[in-house]
Amino acid sequence: GDMAGGFDVLKDVYKSQVYDLASYRNRLEDTPVIPERVITRPPSAELRPDQKDQDSLPDYDTLDAILTLYIDEDMGYQEIIDKGYEAELVAKTIKMVDNSEYKRLQAPIGTKVSHKAFGRERRYPLVNKWSIKG
């Protein structure tokens, strides 16, 4: 799974960037290194049969845009809504980020490529049902 291993190369990369990197890597060779079916297959956490990420998440461009505003730009709930995103989607995204904070503390080390990576640059409480939404 995503949390396996001793070094996480993609730790600090949004999902839409992973797809861009895969496509870029394939353009460097005459024969694709990453099979096209891997890139075009609907994403899934594969936690249950026929599960697709898009069943419970927005498209990755939208999700990554909200995540960028919340994580990288330090915008709050209302500020993100003011950018034109649905309140329910923003609340759900923020809740998913906040509820997964403990997982990031268990993750292996990895490369830092963003303006603000999880870890030393972004630490949030794990207890008391803390949330930035408000």
At which residue positions do the language-model features occur?
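ATP/NTP-dependent adenylation/nucleotidyl-transfer catalytic domains that generate, transfer
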Residues: 1-134
